[in-house]
Curated annotation (Swiss-Prot):
Keywords for this protein: Cell junction, Cytoplasm, Cytoskeleton, Phosphoprotein
Protein name from the UniProt record: Inactive tyrosine-protein kinase PEAK1
Boundaries of every Protein kinase domain copy: 1302-1664
Composition-biased stretches (Acidic residues): 1076-1086
Gene: Peak1
Source species: Mus musculus
Region (Required for homodimerization): 1274-1300, 1659-1732
Subunit text: Homodimer. Interacts with BCAR1 and CRK. Interacts with PRAG1. Interacts (when phosphorylated at Tyr-1177) with SHC1 (via PID domain). Found in a complex with PPP1CA, PPP1CC and SHC1. Interacts (when phosphorylated at Tyr-632) with tensin TNS3 (when phosphorylated on the SH2 domain); TNS3 also interacts with integrins ITGB1, ITGB3 and ITGB5 and mediates their association with PEAK1.
Residue stretches spanning the membrane: none
Localization per record: Cytoplasm, Cytoskeleton; Cell junction, Focal adhesion
Length: 1735
């Protein structure tokens, strides 16, 4: 246990001895240490960093980054320099944050004491080693004394006592103290040793023992590499002492750490952010003089700049975030501290919080107790925290009590930075803080003295994230750090006080009033939103984690109050006050490697900005953030973030800007009065968190809780921290009510902060509030922390502005759910994606996550399993990522509006928990998400296992293969995960003919990244089923069409795994999904759309988002799994056995995204899969939405027009609108196209409408009908109208008949692949762009489906996705091919008749799949789930790399039996024998073609590639039953007209509706035909003219006579069509009109349709002659009207006869004729007759 005599810094464990692995402080090298600090301060960067930290932490050393609102994460991917060193250097400068003032008592005293710049290396901050040493010595002595020493030290730190003078013992006492706390923390941080001191240390602390050099007494269980005394809140108060210790420690740190860091940087390529000093690589250097803290972007995801001074400890946080602490924030106080630091480097409040929480907690942890005397308590608490997150609450309470005392004693404005070392031990995150120990020493042994570091001034400088290689960095955005910096310190300390566990309830009460006030004031000052968040991890993970940390949660809320939402978590954004990095399982789950978006959460969530930010925080400080673009794979994602921010502005109005993690800024001052209660409440909040969390589901409860909070007049912990600024009695809480619900609960405790019962009530209320709070204005992350989370949530819920509106609790709850909604879903997904991390975190907190608000958080996280962690930087196409992000962020934005109230509520559950996590130090959240995800080894392992079956991002983030595109819901292609390590792959398995096997590819979404072919698929499906439990998948997903079709989707959802793994939170998880669903509903506007899956992360990985607004699968996992397993195991196994003929396609992730999905399905997919439009093809948002987002709604009709909006738009709404519009148009207009396109809806709606109208009006109508019977003309008119109306109804009915089951767009996801089986291994049709196989769907055995295997190679897949995008932007139409699901899969060569079977077949086995998986991962590390396109591309690439070919596979409902080219070729003899019949059939086919093309026009789509081989023929019978090729005759007969389908939109042009003003200016000199793109406008018309020749067995006139196009030909130059039938002349006229060389004179496709209708059923030659001889227009009209009346009557008679003919039935021609006659008018007839006559 004793340290060796000589301290040799360990290369890989800075701060630890390479011989004894003990912290340097334990080596009795006080003289050197003391000297070193000063030296470092002056000379070394690390020293400076340390000094800065010391300066900041003047009483509570806090990482400089924590001081300033800083980018919590440094992009792991640095563009040019992969070295972290450069990044660190930049960070050093960044470290120059405003000194964070420690408000030991949370009074301004402390805060104001050390407003010095951290940069004033020992001097400004009392940086001098002597003061610190004194503090350390005192601490050491006091530590030796156990409580007394610690208490004294704390007092000294607080400035309450003259203990600092005890410098005589400086070396010994200081060293002892350092060894005990500072050392432990320092070392733990430096060494990257698990910050057992912090939180997990509670458990892990047992393993480590920090002993004072002169004593055998174990002062701490935490030996942190960077466990600097300055980091402990106790020491913080005594800046000098701490700084002495720090410097002393830092000396070693500077030398060893610097070297170690350098080595790490060089050797690992991903340096841990140790506390790099200004000259040493220190990531955070704080200089008061500098305006910005510059944080270098790192190449490694671990290398992130934490708001907290970034030490290796932070890196360790990344690696070993204690799950317990993280989740439970049991290190709540510690985490608070850390969070504060992380949240806003400049937020003293955060430090304070951290000091209190972290220091007291860490003290407890490190010391095994608050003081050496309480090691058991600490450990117990730590354990409890880890188990329940409640113990953390206790610790926090202790911390709070300490803080209360300290605060009361010392209102120093120290910039001491509390360097908390978060370490993951046993899957738990431990926060190590040295300060806490000293504080603990000062306070009673049983009590942790929490010293709150409250930055009095908004000195904290905004953080700039800059790549050390600046050329690589580009200014990205402005982040407002002012709020975070100002209010950071306020909320936390108070929370600490109130959350002080019963251990120090008395202290807590004493502390709360004044301290809280001071803190609150400060909190109000500090409003910082994390500059950037991992779109995926932060949002997704924070809420979950926060809620999970129910026990520690209460502490977190205070921190949350101060800190903005965690940078990494959009949810955090909503935190009203400072961002406190929250150790949320989600965040920790997300592993950030250097491969993960530059080690940053997928993107920096940029506080969007000035307007919103200004609104959110009155004292907003705009911090230009320079982000290394290279750090992010997709800037598009950033764009989406920015765009989201725009939306966020709305959210920000509530101040809980949901747009970003950082956005949550709440006025700390308002929370002032509730802070004490918050402190008191927090511990119980944790306890209640569990109970309340379960309750949380009911809105009533939320309201009650909220009301209770309001009644109590106390803000939730979040608010509490805000209230801290003002007196605890402040009623500002009401303003913060949303956040105040929890606050209120805790607030009531504030008055009796020491009264646990009150706290319990507060906790219960908070929990209830959390459960029921509609996300105030902040994402409901607080619930996860329970009281703390609750308060945090409320804080987040109520942004700074919201603080003033405290009185409006419900509005704040409405806090933009969008942020959290997407974030929640994203977070939830991230959690599930990083299932193991989440599960661990949640589990570590014990069942607490499940039982408590933390559980809520977990639950919500689970319910909305965060989308897979942000996919590796090369996630998915920027477009896809941006879409996801936009979705997430738009969702975040939406929550701002009261409209999201319900949504907010739901979000509150999921997001609220997230918020709780965010509310906890939001920054910590970021860290958590970064660190934790990265750090939790257990989680990582689990995640890895899970990831084995999932795509793994470059950063190690598991890109859960959520059904990549919601569209890929069909299981016949199974994406299975044979092993956890296997990637999902879609295996096409088919039986030769029905026997050989069905093409069954079970696409288990996320589970089977590496699954091997069939076995893997089968295994994967099973695994996925097992891994993704139904509980994980919300029922909502099931409700979605997609999820309905394939409940399996959710199984693939990473979130599902998370929920599943977190067995404890399974039950809670389901409710959160509901809540989340509600959120999503609000976001998506379609409740069904809210899919439980947070697909945002899956493909986007960053949208986390966000992006993502994908939600966690709502379907019960079981259902989904079952669906996946449905045909998967049996069929796949069978197929494997029967594979011989058609080897199963290597399982590959199939992009369902590109395939049309019913909107409901699509949304479900979006939510669950977060599927985005194929990234490869950045098409219209419609495309993305429809392919990625419209997975839910089958009705792309309505949706398609706005398919791009489908992601956010309720599918139901969309569909009805188009149908209404279409039906109206078709009724009102003659356009058959409208009737066709909306025929189904038109039928149902019109039929319902007109039919009902007729019924309702029938009696009056009958009366009217019988009037005027004496007037013949009147009677004739009535008969005419009756026939017309009847025909219209019949036409609509026919549409319903022929479009039966096809009006709703299907979106089959990967989960549905297992349910598909190829019925034959022989293609039913080979078209120009693909080959079609018939398939059966197990869930719809009566319907036939076709599997379309695109011929395009992987490189050309983008073209296909473009085609999909275009198609999905269109509503369903009878003559336009529908994609029911699209995937990228490895297809056996035998299924590719056009390819050489040798090469592809080799890759048909499962090994290829695994290879594919690996390749997919390699493919840029983009998580396939992120963007369907990307995954497909990946898969394509993989396939290409492998011997198998990767092809886009699409499921369609229309089973083509031949192409028009085949039909024309086979009908040559028929044309000669029966020209009339054949040419009539040609007219019918051309009419359908024109109808389909006309359908494209309103959507500005031009096919541009009309060829006979791209037109498919489907044998169609009324009722929508498509006949297979076998029953169909190669040559369709007139008796059974064939349905024509337009396919292959790869060359389609779609004009964007969005006009860029710049483009408009540029177009001022362009010709109209160019501007209007007229060159494409009538391209289809021209190509249709060519098709007329080709269908009549004539050559293309321009092929035969190329000079025609070269010269200005005229219609007369075109070849003549032989007059073989009555239709020949009309076709000639039509062809000449369509081939008019002048586009302006070329007839429209609608006119061409009218001509064809006229040729088929219109007036004949005899009528034309009479028509021409008619003298007047009236005569002509009368003539046409009479003809029309007769034709309508005849058709009515025909329908009547066919209705009696049981065998006959209505034919396709009858329907087409009915459309014509029902909507024809004399004017339209006259117009067509004129065209035919005069052209």
């Amino acid at each position: 246990m004793s340290a060796c005599n000589t301290f040799t810094e360990h290369v890989w464990k800075p701060g630890e001895c390479k011989n004894c692995f003990k912290p340097k402080s334990l080596h009795q090298l006080p003289p050197d240490s003391e000297k070193t600090p000063i030296t470092h301060g002056s000379g070394k960067t690390n020293a400076n960093h340390s000094n800065n930290h010391r300066v900041r932490s003047t009483g509570n050393f806090r990482p400089p980054v924590a001081k300033k609102p800083t980018i919590a994460v440094k992009p792991t991917m640095m563009v040019a320099d992969g070295q972290s060193v450069c990044g660190e250097l930049s960070i050093q400068e960044h470290c120059e944050n405003k000194p964070v003032i420690l408000g030991w008592n949370q009074n301004k005293t402390s805060l104001s004491q050390k407003p010095l710049n951290n940069n004033s290396e020992g001097d400004a901050e009392g940086f001098g080693s002597d003061p610190q040493q004194c503090a350390n010595n005192d601490s050491a002595q006091k530590i030796s004394n156990n409580n007394n020493g610690l208490t004294e030290v704390l007092k000294e730190i607080a400035g309450l006592e003259a203990t600092p003078p005890v410098r005589g013992n400086e070396t010994n006492a200081r060293e002892t103290f350092l060894g005990r706390i500072n050392d432990c923390y320092k070392r733990s941080l430096e060494r990257k040793i698990p910050p057992s001191c912090m939180t997990g240390s509670m458990k892990d602390s047992q393993g480590k023992h920090v002993i004072l050099s002169g004593s055998a007494e174990v002062i701490s269980n935490e030996g942190g590499r960077f466990c600097y005394p300055e980091f402990s809140s106790g020491e913080e108060s005594e800046e000098d002492v701490l700084f002495s210790n720090m410097e002393e420690e830092h000396e070693s740190w500077d030398e060893s750490d610097e070297e170690l860091l350098a080595m790490e940087i060089r050797m690992r390529g991903q340096p841990r952010f140790a506390n790099f000093r200004a000259n040493t690589l220190s990531p955070v250097r704080f200089f008061v003089s500098k305006k910005w803290n510059t944080i270098p972007l790192r190449n490694k995801s671990l290398q992130r700049i934490c708001a907290v001074d970034y030490d290796d400890s932070y890196d360790e946080i990344l690696n070993g975030y204690e799950e317990n602490s993280g989740v439970s924030y049991g290190q709540g106080s510690v985490q608070s501290t850390i969070s504060s630091d992380c949240t806003s480097p400049g937020s003293s409040f955060t430090e304070e919080s951290r000091s209190e929480t972290a220091s007291s907690l860490s003290q407890k942890v490190c010391n095994g107790g608050i003081s050496p005397g309480n090691p058991g308590n600490s450990k117990d608490i730590a354990e409890t925290e880890s188990n329940f997150e409640s113990p953390p609450g206790n610790n926090e309470e202790k911390d709070e009590s300490l803080t209360s005392k300290s605060s009361v004693k010392v209102p120093e404005t120290h910039k001491a930075v509390l360097a908390l070392r978060l370490q993951e031990k046993d899957g738990k995150i431990a926060v190590h803080t040295e300060k806490p120990e000293s504080k603990a020493s000062t306070d009673i042994a049983g009590q942790a003295v929490t010293i709150s570091l409250v930055p009095v001034e908004e000195q904290t400088k905004p953080y700039r994230v800059v790549n050390l290689e600046q050329p690589l960095c580009k200014p990205y955005t402005v982040v407002d750090v002012s709020a975070a910096m100002a209010s950071e310190h306020l909320g936390r300390p108070k929370i600490k006080g109130s959350s002080s566990t019963p251990n120090s309830p008395v202290t807590s009460p004493a502390l709360t009033p004044g301290q809280i006030n001071a803190h609150l004031k400060k909190s109000s000052a500090i409003r910082y939103q994390e500059v950037w968040t991992s779109s995926t991890s932060p949002r997704q993970k924070i809420p979950k984690i926060e809620l999970s940390t129910g026990g520690p949660g209460p502490n977190v809320p205070p921190r949350k109050n101060c800190h903005k939402s965690a940078p990494t978590s959009p949810t955090a954004t909503n935190i009203s006050s400072k961002t406190i990095p929250v150790k949320s399982p989600n965040l920790s789950e997300i592993k950030f490697n250097s491969y993960n978006n530059a080690g940053m959460p997928p993107f920096p969530i940029i506080i969007h900005d000035e307007p919103s930010y200004a609104r959110s925080s009155k004292n907003a400080i705009k911090v230009p953030i320079v982000i290394n673009p290279n750090a992010y794979d997709n800037l598009a994602i950033y764009k989406s973030f920015l765009g989201t921010s725009g939306e966020l502005s709305v959210k920000e109005k509530t101040t809980s800007v949901i747009s970003h993690t950082y956005e949550e800024i709440e006025t700390e001052s308002k929370v002032s009065d509730s802070t004490p209660s918050k402190l008191t409440d927090c511990p119980q909040a944790k306890g209640f968190s569990n109970s309340t969390e379960r309750k949380r589901g009911s809105v009533a409860q939320k309201v009650q809780e909220f009301n209770n909070c309001l009644n109590r007049g106390q803000s939730s912990p979040q608010r509490s921290y805000s209230s801290t600024h003002s007196s605890p009695a402040k009623i500002q809480r009401p303003t913060q009510e949303p956040a105040g619900k929890t606050e209120g609960a805790q607030g009531s405790q504030v008055p009796g902060s020491s009264s646990n019962s009150t706290r319990e009530k507060a906790s219960a209320v908070l929990c209830q509030i959390v459960a029921s709070i509609q996300p105030p204005q902040t994402p409901p992350e607080a619930p996860q922390s329970s009281p703390k989370a609750c308060s945090v949530e409320e804080l987040y819920a109520v942004p700074p502005d919201a603080d003033t509106t405290k009185s409006i609790p419900k509005n704040p709850p409405v806090r933009p759910k969008s942020l959290f909604t997407s974030q929640s879903s994203g977070e939830g997904e991230a959690h599930q994606t990083t299932e193991s991390p989440t599960a661990k975190i949640q589990k570590d907190p014990s069942t607490k996550p499940v039982t408590s608000p933390p559980s809520k958080l977990v639950t919500s996280a689970q319910s909305e399993p965060p989308p897979p962690f942000p996919p590796p930087r090369s996630t998915s196409s920027p477009y896809h990522a941006s879409n996801l992000l936009q979705r997430h962020f738009t969702n975040w934005t939406k929550p701002t509006s009261p409209t999201r109230s319900t949504e907010a509520e739901s979000i509150l559950h999921s997001e609220g928990s997230r918020r709780a996590a965010d509310a906890k130090p939001k920054r910590w959240i970021s860290f958590k998400s970064f660190f934790r995800r990265r750090k939790t080894d257990e989680e990582e392992e689990k995640e890895k296992e899970r990831e084995k079956g999932k795509l793994v991002g470059l950063d190690g983030t598991v890109i859960h293969m959520l059904p990549p595109p919601p569209v890929q819901r069909h299981h016949w292609f199974t994406e299975a995960k044979g092993e956890a390590s296997e990637k999902p792959a879609i295996v096409f398995m088919y039986r030769c003919d029905p026997d050989q096997g069905h093409l069954s590819v079970d696409q288990s979404k996320a589970g089977a990244e590496k699954g091997r072919a069939e076995e893997v698929l089968l295994r994967n499906s099973e695994e996925k089923k097992s891994s993704y439990l139904p509980s994980q998948i919300p029922d909502k997903a099931c409700s979605r069409v997609t999820h309905e079709v394939a409940g399996e989707l959710s199984p693939r959802d990473p979130r599902t795994p998370a929920g599943k793994q977190d067995g404890t939170s399974v039950t809670p998880t389901l409710p959160p999904p509901d809540l989340e669903r509600e959120e999503e509903k609000d976001d998506t506007l379609d409740p069904t759309d809210v899919s439980p899956c947070s697909a945002t992360y899956s493909n986007l990985g960053q949208s986390r988002a966000a992006m993502i607004p994908p939600k966690h699968p709502r379907h019960p996992k079981g259902a989904v799994d079952d669906a996946i397993a449905f045909g998967e195991k049996t069929d796949q196994e069978g197929l494997n056995a029967s594979q011989p003929t058609p080897p199963p396609l290597p399982k590959k992730m199939i992009r369902a995204n590109t395939e049309p999905i019913s909107k409901d399905l699509q949304k479900a997919m979006e939510s669950s899969l977060c599927v985005m439009a194929n990234p490869t093809y950045d098409i219209d948002p419609n495309w993305d939405a429809s392919s990625a987002g419209s997975s839910i709604s089958y009705e792309l009709k309505g949706l398609d027009v706005e398919s791009y909006e489908s992601l956010e738009r309720p599918l139901h709404k969309e569909r009805p609108v188009p149908s209404a519009a279409n039906s109206i148009s078709s009724l009102a207009t003659l356009s058959v196209k409208d009737r066709f396109s909306n025929s189904m809806e038109s039928l149902s709606s019109r039929r319902g409408l007109s039919y009902r109208q007729t019924r309702s009006i029938q009696k009056p109508q009958r009366q009217a009908l019988y009037r005027g019977l004496d007037n013949r003309e009147e009677v004739v008119g009535k008969l005419r109208s009756l026939h017309t109306d009847a025909l219209k109804r019949l036409a609509v009915k026919c549409e319903d008949l022929f479009m039966a089951g096809q009006k709703d767009q299907l979106r089959f996801g990967v989960d549905s692949w297992s349910d598909f089986r190829l019925t034959s291994d022989k293609p039913c049709c080979e078209a120009g762009d693909a080959v079609y196989y018939t398939a059966s769907y197990a869930k719809d055995p009566l319907s036939n489906y076709a599997v379309k295997i695109c011929k395009s190679k992987a490189k050309e897949s983008q073209q296909y996705y473009h085609s999909l995008a275009v198609r999905q932007s269109l509503p369903v139409h009878f003559n336009i091919q529908q994609d029911c699901g699209h995937f990228l899969a490895e297809v056996p060569s035998r299924l590719l008749p056009w390819e050489d079977p040798d090469a592809p077949e080799k890759a048909e086995d499962g090994t290829e799949d695994s290879e594919e998986e690996g390749k997919a991962e390699t493919l840029g590390g983009n998580p396939e789930p992120c963007s369907e396109t990307e995954p497909s591309q990946k898969e394509n690439q993989r396939v290409t790399n492998r011997k198998q070919r990767s092809h886009v596979v699409v499921i369609t409902r229309e089973v083509p039996h031949l192409t028009v080219a085949d039909f024309v070729r086979d009908s040559l003899a028929h044309h000669g024998n029966s020209p009339d019949l054949y040419e009539r059939q040609v007219c019918l086919l051309l009419l359908q073609l024109c109808s389909g093309l006309e359908h494209l026009k309103p959507y500005h789509v031009t096919h541009c590639d009309l060829r006979l081989e791209n037109l498919l023929l489907v044998q169609h019978q009324p009722g929508g039953a498509a006949q297979g090729p076998s029953p169909a005759d190669p040559c369709p007969t007139l008796a059974c007209p064939t349905r024509l389908i337009v396919s292959n939109f790869s060359q389609a042009k779609q004009k964007s509706h969005l006009v860029d003003p710049q483009i408009l200016r540029d177009q001022s000199r362009l010709a109209p035909e160019i501007i209007t793109a007229t060159q494409y406008k009538k391209c289809d018309e021209f190509q249709t003219g060519i098709l007329i020749y080709e269908m009549l067995h004539l050559p293309n006139p321009f092929d035969e006579n190329p000079e025609l196009k070269e010269k200005e030909y005229t219609r007369t130059d075109l070849p003549r069509i032989p007059l073989r039938s009555p239709y020949s002349w009309g076709l000639q006229q039509l062809a000449s009109c369509l081939l008019n060389p002048n586009p302006s004179e070329r007839i429209l496709i609608s006119d061409a349709k009218g001509i064809l209708q006229c040729l088929l059923w219109g007036p004949r030659e005899d009528l034309f002659q009479i028509f021409t001889t008619s003298a007047t227009l009236a005569q002509k009209n009368a003539l046409l009207q009479n003809w029309l009346d007769i034709k309508r009557t005849l058709l009515m008679i025909k329908f009547a006869e066919k209705s009696l003919d049981r065998e006959g039935g209505i034919s396709l021609e009858d329907w087409l004729c009915a459309q014509y006659l029902a909507f024809a008018t004399t004017d339209s007839l006259s117009y067509i007759v004129k065209i035919l006559q005069y052209r």
